[in-house]
């Protein structure tokens, strides 16, 4: 895959739609080979490739650094967990899986309430939605849960007086991710994995027709 021709918006869209259930890459692979990029275009291409390929590792690193910085503040740790959950809701696969599990659990106690939490049906034309698909969680657009989670996180951080620590941890985690993604040389496995996921996406779209 030619990452030079991939825009940043396309990478964000791919991260939102791709499956995050895959296990993280091994530490041996994660810390295998490092080198400075030869040019700005090479750096941008490497950055986009690594952010996509090591997405699970970066998410774990992000949560770990955030939790480590707030280990002495239980409320702030809870806020960090809510932040991680809210960000995970932005991924289509995670949000849909969470929604199904919640509805399945609620159905055991109240089938009528579970039926109301089902997302509304979208008009379909030739196997595709007429409008851009909206992901629902418990009958509400996922943006509602994302905003509620982030608001609750901010309140917990402010209450625990850990807001500055949170900003410090966020900055540290993002810098570590940016540094690794900039210096880690993409290997053949990363390229082959990208081609495989591209094929799956094309086949999925073809099967929906």
From Swiss-Prot:
Keyword list, A-Z: Endosome, Membrane, Transmembrane, Transmembrane helix, Transport
Signal peptide: none
GO BP of this protein: vesicle-mediated transport
Intrachain disulfide bonds: none
Membrane topology according to the record: Multi-pass membrane protein
UniProt KW Aminoacyl-tRNA synthetase keyword: no
Main location: membrane
GO cellular component, one term: endosome membrane
Transmembrane intervals: 51-72, 76-98, 143-163, 164-184
InterPro entries on file: Prenylated_rab_accept_PRA1
Superkingdom of the organism of origin: Eukaryota
Compartment(s) where it occurs, according to its Swiss-Prot or TrEMBL record: Endosome membrane
Family to which this protein belongs: Belongs to the PRA1 family.
Function, as annotated: May be involved in both secretory and endocytic intracellular trafficking in the endosomal/prevacuolar compartments.
Name the UniProt record assigns to this protein: PRA1 family protein A3
Naturally occurring in which organism (per UniProt): Arabidopsis thaliana
Gene responsible for this protein: PRA1A3
């Amino acid at each position: 895959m030619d990452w030079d021709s991939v825009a940043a918006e396309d990478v964000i869209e791919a991260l939102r739609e791709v499956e995050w259930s895959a296990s993280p890459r091994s530490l041996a692979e994660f810390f295998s080979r490092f080198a400075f990029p030869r040019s700005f275009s090479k750096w941008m291409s490497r950055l986009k490739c690594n952010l996509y390929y090591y997405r699970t590792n970066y998410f774990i690193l992000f949560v770990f650094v955030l939790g480590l910085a707030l280990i002495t503040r239980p409320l702030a740790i809870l806020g960090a967990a809510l932040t991680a959950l809210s960000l995970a809701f932005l991924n289509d696969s995670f949000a849909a899986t969470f929604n199904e599990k919640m509805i399945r659990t609620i159905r055991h106690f109240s089938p009528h309430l579970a039926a109301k939490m089902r997302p509304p049906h979208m008009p379909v034309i030739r196997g595709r939605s007429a409008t851009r698909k909206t992901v629902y969680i418990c009958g509400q657009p996922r943006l509602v849960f994302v905003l509620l989670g982030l608001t609750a996180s901010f309140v917990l951080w402010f209450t625990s007086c850990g807001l500055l620590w949170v900003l410090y941890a966020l900055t540290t985690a993002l810098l570590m991710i940016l540094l690794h993604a900039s210096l880690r040389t993409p290997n053949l496995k990363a390229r082959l994995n990208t081609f495989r996921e591209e094929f799956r996406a094309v086949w999925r779209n073809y099967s929906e027709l």
